[in-house]
Curated annotation (Swiss-Prot):
PANTHER family, sorted: PHOSPHOMETHYLPYRIMIDINE SYNTHASE, CHLOROPLASTIC, THIAMINE BIOSYNTHESIS PROTEIN THIC
Cofactor note: Binds 1 [4Fe-4S] cluster per subunit. The cluster is coordinated with 3 cysteines and an exchangeable S-adenosyl-L-methionine.
UniProt biased composition (Low complexity): 10-27
Record's catalysed reaction(s): 5-amino-1-(5-phospho-beta-D-ribosyl)imidazole + S-adenosyl-L-methionine = 4-amino-2-methyl-5-(phosphooxymethyl)pyrimidine + CO + 5'-deoxyadenosine + formate + L-methionine + 3 H(+)
Chain intervals for the UniProt region annotation (Disordered): 1-38
Pfam (any one): ThiC_Rad_SAM
Record-given protein name: Phosphomethylpyrimidine synthase
Positions annotated to bind Zn(2+): 459, 523
Length: 691
């Protein structure tokens, strides 16, 4: 089945149980049961997480509707009080990247794409024009190619471009507006989104963080967003030809973001699968998507992704340019690359990774490395430089690239083509020489009001990570840093989502603005749906840990809410407040599957007799009883019935405590240990058992 078949199957009006079936997803016959479950789940584009609903916060105008996920919480049980009088817990609001796929009031049709959220904002500024058609040679040729007609996205709008001003190229970047004091709807949207209704939360307590020079106000305002973009400390990646995208911001004074890589290769994957990966990734919290396709139909794949993506899409244009010269790096030219930039900008790519810092003089510095040049883009440009013995056209034509990007508001992601591929190669002169060049290029881009972020490593031991962050801030004048990990050890293939998340949490704390996720398949193979989810959840943990360490305003509120639910044995709320409710619930139900256990005052770790939190609650009740007794003695006569009631309450609680922490508990502990010893010998004295 081809992508053209999706339309009849995916066009549906959403309901709470609706599913938009993109049945063109390919599922290998040999897949495991777990893989099959994840593939099936990924087809259901509309499934929202438990106890959640999509809500919108309106801005200063009716068309600024900022999406959030509202999590409904159960009331707090109060012993001896009717359920109708239990303490009510307000709903909790979290940042939501899933787009309208989880909106029950939206019709999803993948063949038509998402609603054009930003279209009117772009038009009303009056500084863009709609072209008569595609202006890139390759785009025009592709449109005439009948062999790809069945793969083509059917509803392609004519692209927009900045109007010329006084005979010069126009500029429509968010940085251009910000530097002129203009607060755009995108900036207001972001301010609401970043604040996450935190002022309405009940428990905003948190520890003071270590910011390493970052400065974030208690409430994010549109003016603060504007000032950060104007200074170059943050970027808003929003191409005018991707009006479907929901505005977001990348900068160290905002929430740490994560990026998910997808893309086909010559070895496999289809357009259908890439669209499915994108919707799956954004459902679990990917803030950005990079399409790293290198296989067939790169142009068509990208069109489908952009038209259906609620988050910014980034690419590495040199990959497609290389395909146009049949993979021969030496045959690349500025003209081919320029045409590729225009082609992708007119499709709506929000940011380009461009390895303009790979200079001829840096290439020999990699000769003594253990793993040489590991960046695909870096190796392509290094080979070109050596073949022609001159600086790459990415470097010599950098200002020409800026002229293109400011007409569409495409942001730079200046690539680290000489990043280290192992711990041994970290922080060498090749890596840091390129970083200093990226700092110089940042100033050139800012001269054109083009937004910039800087890519970073890689593989770096923990004790050497901060040196990377400090040098980046110094040489790149606080431009946002965007890193792959870094991996903190090289000995754990299959677990590199963990080795890299350790480094990601650290460098995020030190000031990195966006973390590129790593899946368990890193260095081993192409990730499936489960790998994508595992990578995203792992990196959401790292990003959140960094926000906590920085003391980002409101960052700890979700931790407080979940901890309160845990202490009060509100099991469903614990699951629903988690980053991955499905897995939390699944693990709990493996040992305590009954519905009654969802309200039990214990878990399978300690059991009903030895739950530390239940004992603590009893201690609190005991203390409260003592206070009630003391207060009653001080306020009523000895003959009062209230005094008898208070004494009865304290005796009851006292008895409960003795049962749990006194001699009875000790006897039960010894009896339980004896029973488990007997069971251990009876079952063959095996440390581990097959399950």
């Amino acid at each position: 089945m081809t992508i053209s078949d999706i339309g009849s199957q995916a066009s549906t009006t959403t309901s709470s149980k609706a599913t938009a079936k993109a049945d063109a997803l390919k599922t290998p016959a040999h897949r495991s049961e777990t893989d099959a479950r994840f593939e099936e789940d990924a087809r259901d584009l509309h499934r929202i997480l438990p106890a959640s609903r999509k809500v919108y916060i309106e801005g200063s105008r009716p068309d600024i509707q900022v999406p959030m996920r509202e999590i409904t919480l159960d009331p707090t049980p109060i012993q001896g009080v009717p359920e109708s009088e239990w303490e009510q817990n307000p709903p909790f609001y979290v940042y939501d990247t899933s787009g309208v796929y989880t909106d029950p009031n939206t019709t999803i049709d993948l063949t038509k794409g998402l609603p054009k959220l930003r279209e009117e904002w772009i038009k009303e500024r009056g500084d863009t024009e709609q072209l008569s058609g595609l202006s890139s040679d390759y785009g025009q040729a592709r449109a005439r190619d009948i062999s790809t007609a069945n793969l083509r996205f059917a509803h392609i709008d004519k692209p927009r471009r900045a109007k010329a001003v006084d005979g010069k190229v126009g500029n429509v970047t968010q940085m251009h507006y910000a530097r002129r004091g203009i607060i755009t709807p995108e900036m207001e949207y972001i301010a609401i989104r970043e604040t996450q209704k935190q002022h309405e939360l009940t428990d905003m307590r948190q520890h003071e963080g270590e910011t390493f020079g970052a400065h974030t106000p208690a409430i994010i305002t549109p003016e603060f967003v504007r000032s950060e973009v104007a200074a170059g400390r943050a970027i808003i990646p929003n191409n005018i030809n991707h009006p479907e995208s929901e505005p977001m911001i990348i900068g160290r004074n905002f929430l740490v973001k994560i990026n998910a890589n997808i893309g086909n290769s010559a070895l496999g994957s289809s357009i259908d699968e890439e669209v499915s990966k994108m919707t799956w990734a954004t459902r679990w919290g990917a803030d950005n998507i990079m399409d790293l396709s290198t296989g067939n139909h790169i142009h068509e794949t990208r069109e489908w992704l952009i038209r259906n993506s609620p988050v910014p899409i980034g690419t590495v244009p040199i990959y497609q340019a290389l395909e146009k010269v049949d993979g021969v790096a030496e045959d690349l030219t500025w003209e081919i690359f320029r045409d590729t930039l225009i082609e992708q900008a007119e499709q709506g790519v929000d940011y380009f990774t461009i390895h303009a810092g790979v200079l001829l003089r840096y290439v020999p510095l990699t000769a003594n490395r253990l793993t040489g040049i590991v960046s695909r883009g870096g190796s392509i440009m290094a080979q070109w430089c050596l073949a022609h013995h001159k600086e790459s056209f990415l470097y010599t034509h950098f200002e020409d690239i800026c002229e293109i990007m400011k007409q569409y508001d495409v942001a730079f992601s200046l690539g680290d083509g000489l990043r280290p591929g192992c711990l041994q190669d970290a922080n060498d002169e090749a890596q840091f020489g390129e970083l200093r060049t990226l700092g110089e290029l940042t100033q050139v881009a800012w001269k054109h009001d083009v937004q910039v972020m800087i890519e970073g490593p890689g593989h770096v031991a923990m004790n050497r990570i901060k040196e990377n962050m400090d040098l980046q801030l110094e040489t790149c004048a606080d431009a946002p840093f965007y890193t792959l990990g870094p991996l903190t050890t090289d000995i754990a293939p299959g677990y590199d989502h963990i080795t890299s998340a350790i480094g990601a949490a650290m460098i995020g704390w030190f000031g990195t603005a966006m973390l590129c996720y790593v899946t368990p398949k890193e260095h081993l193979g192409l990730p499936n749906k489960k790998d994508v989810k595992d990578g995203i959840i792992t990196y959401k943990i790292a990003a959140h840990a960094a926000d906590l360490a920085k003391g980002h305003p409101g960052a700890q509120a979700r931790d407080n809410a979940l901890s309160k639910a845990r202490f009060e044995f509100r099991w469903d709320d614990q699951f629903n407040l988690a980053l991955d409710p499905d897995t939390a619930r699944e693990f709990h139900d493996e040992t305590l599957p009954k519905d009654a256990h969802k309200s039990a005052h214990f878990c399978s770790m300690c059991g009903p007799k030895f739950c530390s939190m239940k004992i603590t609650q009893n201690v609190r009740d005991y203390a409260a009883g003592l206070k009630t007794l003391a207060d009653t003695k001080n306020s009523v006569s000895p003959q009062s019935g209230a005094l008898n009631d208070a004494e009865h309450l304290i005796k009851k609680v006292d008895t409960q405590l003795v049962e749990q922490v006194g001699s009875a508990s000790a006897e039960e502990i010894h009896q339980g240990m004896a029973e488990m010893t007997e069971k251990y010998h009876k079952e063959g004295r095996q440390l581990y058992k097959e399950v």
